């Protein structure tokens, strides 16, 4: 859910992780064409060229685990090397954030699993299911054989929303084992194959759409810095709007991708129904948005952060609000206007939405929210990265003087 450029501002700026938790899903998948809608076909025809992004798949975490299984176990040294693989970074990062998962516990999970038992660890880890090495091998081989197809489909879905000629570094997709999510994005994209393994025999159904969602986050992270700063009312509102933009557009793109493909799997149908229902029910959750805004206005920033976390947890109602905002902008003002907001930020996203509200439509922003967005545009929103850095440095100075 956020940028991949690292801003070392100690818990003020960070790489946003874009995940909705495990998508509800079962069902088989098969290769299918993804025809673009007319306006996107015209845009692609007008500006042909190489893929806008290069995607690399990394299976080392899973391959080494399968090697351990084939050899009947692993030494402590081998497990220590395995746990330090780049593909395990996000799992361990979330383990530190949520608590309960350390490298030692992850190594123990592998050891127990290799002995033929199921390891029940902290919630952030999920579970390691033993005795399914053949299925895991099948998943890896299938994904590997289709990685060009998956990467190409995601790149074409993102093409209309990326600046023409913009150069991106290669994007890496790491496949790992364990976690309470299907996909997350921070410095790279991390896909949890344990959940796909648990869907057997449906396999990799839904992976292509998930990659569209997560690779969008990766690309957006290079276009605009990620900020999660609830240290002041304005920085908190900015952070809230940015998360709405990130998750809203990611879901919008994923939803359109599924619709264009005809929702051929049960996974696609379940997710599509969920997303479309969210579009319809989003106005019912304006009160959730207002509760966060009101907490910020009263300078109850910790409460606001907590409420926002609840609203986004596991694809919660704030995803649907962001999706509806993105849908409204694209429908009324066009996809070019929605794409413009990616480089200009969340205040531009909010303003574009206000200009796209149709007559008779119940707006998702109250008058008070619109007023606060205007104030944000005049204040913190002008230089958000600098403002957060200066505030952090100022608070650190005050703290040192108090000591």
Model-derived features: where do they sit?
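Post-HExxH zinc-binding segment in Zn-dependent metallohydrolases
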Residues: 48-78, 223-292, 359-364, 368
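Boundary at the C-terminal end of the N-terminal hydrophobic targeting segment
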Residues: 22-27
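Pan-zinc metallopeptidase signature
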Residues: 271-403
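Bacterial N-terminal signal peptides
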Residues: 10-21
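N-terminal mature-domain "stem" immediately C-terminal to a signal peptide or N-terminal signal-anchor/transmembrane
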Residues: 30-120, 362-379, 385-399
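Acidic/His-rich structured neighborhood in mature extracellular/periplasmic domains
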Residues: 115-272
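Bacterial N-terminal signal peptides that target proteins for export
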Residues: 1-10
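Structured segments of extracytoplasmic/periplasmic soluble domains
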Residues: 64-72, 82-89, 160-161, 218, ...
């Amino acid at each position: 859910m956020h940028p991949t450029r690292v801003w070392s501002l100690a818990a003020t700026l960070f790489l946003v992780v874009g995940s909705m938790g495990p998508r509800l899903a079962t069902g088989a998948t098969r290769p299918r064409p993804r025809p673009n809608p007319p306006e996107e076909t015209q845009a692609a025809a007008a500006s042909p060229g190489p893929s806008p992004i290069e995607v690399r798949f990394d299976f080392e975490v899973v391959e080494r685990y399968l090697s351990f299984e084939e050899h009947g176990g692993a030494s402590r040294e081998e497990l220590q090397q395995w746990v330090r693989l780049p593909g395990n970074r996000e799992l361990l990062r979330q383990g530190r954030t949520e608590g309960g998962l350390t490298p030692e516990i992850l190594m123990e999970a592998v050891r127990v699993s290799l002995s033929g038992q199921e390891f029940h660890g902290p919630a952030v880890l999920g579970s390691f299911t033993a005795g399914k090495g053949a299925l895991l091998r099948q998943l890896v081989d299938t994904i590997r054989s289709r990685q060009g197809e998956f990467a190409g489909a995601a790149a074409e879905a993102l093409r209309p929303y990326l600046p023409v000629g913009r150069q991106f570094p290669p994007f890496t997709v790491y496949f790992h084992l364990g976690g309470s999510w299907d996909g997350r994005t921070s410095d790279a994209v991390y896909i949890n194959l344990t959940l796909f393994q648990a869907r057997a025999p449906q396999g990799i159904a839904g992976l292509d759409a998930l990659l569209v969602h997560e690779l969008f986050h990766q690309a957006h992270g290079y276009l605009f810095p990620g900020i999660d700063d609830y240290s002041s009312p304005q920085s908190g509102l900015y952070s809230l709007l940015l998360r709405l933009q990130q998750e809203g557009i990611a879901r919008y793109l994923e939803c359109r991708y599924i619709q264009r493909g005809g929702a051929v799997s049960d996974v696609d149908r379940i997710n599509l129904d969920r997303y479309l229902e969210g579009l319809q029910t989003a106005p019912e959750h304006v009160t959730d948005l207002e509760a966060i805004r009101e907490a910020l206005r009263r300078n109850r920033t910790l409460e606001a952060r907590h409420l926002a976390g609840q609203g986004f947890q596991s694809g919660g109602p704030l995803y649907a609000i962001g999706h509806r905002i993105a849908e409204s902008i694209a429908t009324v003002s066009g996809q070019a206007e929605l794409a413009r907001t990616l480089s200009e930020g969340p205040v531009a996203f909010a303003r574009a939405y206000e200009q796209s509200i149709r007559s008779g439509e119940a707006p998702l922003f109250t008058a008070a929210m619109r007023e606060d967005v205007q104030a944000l545009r005049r204040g913190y929103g002008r230089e958000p990265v600098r403002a957060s850095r200066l505030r952090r440095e100022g608070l650190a100075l005050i703290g040192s003087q108090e000591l």
